[in-house]
Amino acid sequence: VEECALVLNPIVKEITLHFENRRDYTIIGWFICGLGAIFYSYEYLLRIAPSVMEHALREHFNLSATGFGLLSSIYYFAYVPMQLPVGVLLDRYGPRRLLTIACLICVVGTFMFTAATVFWIAAAGRFLVGFGSAFAFVGVLKLATIWLPENRLAMVSGMTSALGPIGAMLGDNFMEIFVERLGWIKTMNLTALFGVGLTFILWFGIHDKKGQHRQSGTVSSFKKGMIDLGIIIRSKQIWVNGMYGCLVYLPTTVFAELWGIPYLKHAHGLSAQAAGLANSLLFLGFIIGAPLMGYISDKLFRRKFPMLIGAAGAAIVMMMILYLPGLSESNIQSLMFLLGLLYSAQAIVFAVGRELSPGEAAGTAMAVTNMIVMLGAMFLQPLVGHLLDFSLSAHLGSAAVTGATIDNLQRLYTVDDYQFALSIIPLGILIAAILTFFLKETHAHAPK
């Protein structure tokens, strides 16, 4: 490690000085933000991994749908509350050291998860992964506020939001193949080894400073950061904005990240690979739509209008996916892609959160917004599993469900069971559309 540092540090410093002397930070800024975004994609891959290996995990740990939903959502029991200190810590200490340590924690958690033979050890591993992942998204946004132009904040947040689902697409399309050939344990161990290399890359590649000065987003006093946190978390507009983001993001946090592939396999009869492809098309739609929505919002100097249109359209498409009978595979793929395009308006909430808050608390504002956004996954992933089990028990009887094996349980779920459990998604998106009428229009300007 010391030898690598001796070789790499002078190179990185020379490149940085070259750009500093030219006062042209844009290229190196994109490079640094790109490294952070790779970590965000990596943690996203770890986040959605249980959906790809649902059958293997339920069999290995003997889990009901409720238990499987709980195992996945434990990630968020660390991720969500950590958003409160993450913003303050990033403002205080900078992204470089925190993103590096966070990536290492994700690696340790993944190895713990694969070594587990009982539920609570696996849950502890998922908790650690969630803890480390909590720094990724907001860390990239913090780097963007340091290195990239402020007048393109919505587009930058959209592009950042889009980069995470790239990890999900890799998981849906390639992890399934590795799981079938190597098993879930070896697959996750390989993923953890990649994280070891990424940890070193983050340490040597990321810089917290632009030129010789910290940006105004960096707070010198931890006490000041806590005061800012208190102001932000008491803001009604921050909560309205965050709840919009939470509800319109349910197609990702509840559907695509966990229950989408099982639903498409059981309700529409798709193969594992076809369901993975359809699921990845939702992420592809989001990847394309998030920066596009941000760009349109920046150009119009309006936040609420694209947020309203995106939510209303996403609710309609989600209902079509859930309730239209006889959809062909190509129909499902097209609808999933369209759904991703529409609900990508969610990415705008991070620009709004920044614009509703003072500049020196940029990291804190975006972290609080991200915390609220992720509340949906924390509570609704296990709720969908519970509703599935409840619906199954209602028409089969609890005794039959209790005595069934995991294999039999998965075959016993009906389309009605899934529709009942997943109905919370279109309902939530419709509520998000209504919330836009209570949100202040910032006109793409942060307070002075």
Please name every model-derived segment:
Residues H18-Y25, K209-G242:
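Juxtamembrane intracellular "pre-TM" segments in multi-pass secondary transporters
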Residues P81-W120:
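Conserved MFS/SLC helix-loop-helix module at the cytosolic interface between two early adjacent transmembrane helices
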Residues R92-C103, D298-A312:
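Cytoplasmic membrane-interface "Motif A"-like loop-to-helix N-cap segments
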Residues G125-G164:
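Cytoplasmic helix-loop-helix junction between adjacent transmembrane helices
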Residues T160-D208:
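Helix-loop-helix hairpin linking two adjacent transmembrane segments in secondary transporters
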